[in-house]
Amino acid sequence: MSRILNMNEYISLNHYLILSSLVFTIGMFGLFMHRKNIINILMSIELMLLAVNINFVAFSIYMQELSGQIFSIIILTVAAAETSIGLAILLIYFRNKGSIEITDINQMRG
C-alpha cells in the first residue's frame, strides 16, 4: 500500500494534465479528420470525454478528495449507456439504408 502512495511522488499533476491534453488533442484531431464516418466521430468524442475524466481523477487525487473520482465513474457509466443506445440506432439505420455516412444521415427526414 505504501508503494502505491509513493507513486504520486514520481507522477505529478502536470503529468496527468499533459496526458489528458494529448488524449483530448487526439480526439479533436480524429473528430476533424474523419467527418464522413459516424463510428469514427463517436470514438473521437469518447476519447475527448476520457480526457476530461482523466482531469477529474487527477484533480481529485491532487486535492485528496473522492468526489472527482466518483463523478468520473458516473460520467463513464452514462457515456457507456449513451454509446450503446447510439450504436443500436446506427445498427438499425445501417440495416435499413446500407450506409452510415454522415451525408446519408443528413438526408433523413422524419
From Swiss-Prot:
Reaction equation(s) it catalyzes: a quinone + NADH + 5 H(+)(in) = a quinol + NAD(+) + 4 H(+)(out)
Keyword annotations from UniProtKB, A to Z: Cell inner membrane, Cell membrane, Membrane, NAD, Quinone, Translocase, Transmembrane, Transmembrane helix, Transport
Highest taxon, organism lineage: Bacteria
Membrane topology: Multi-pass membrane protein
Pfam families for the chain: Oxidored_q2 (PF00420)
Listed Gene3D superfamilies: 1.10.287.3510
Subunit structure: NDH-1 is composed of 14 different subunits. Subunits NuoA, H, J, K, L, M, N constitute the membrane sector of the complex.
Name of the protein in its database record: NADH-quinone oxidoreductase subunit K
Organism field: Rickettsia felis (strain ATCC VR-1525 / URRWXCal2)
Gene, per the UniProt record: nuoK
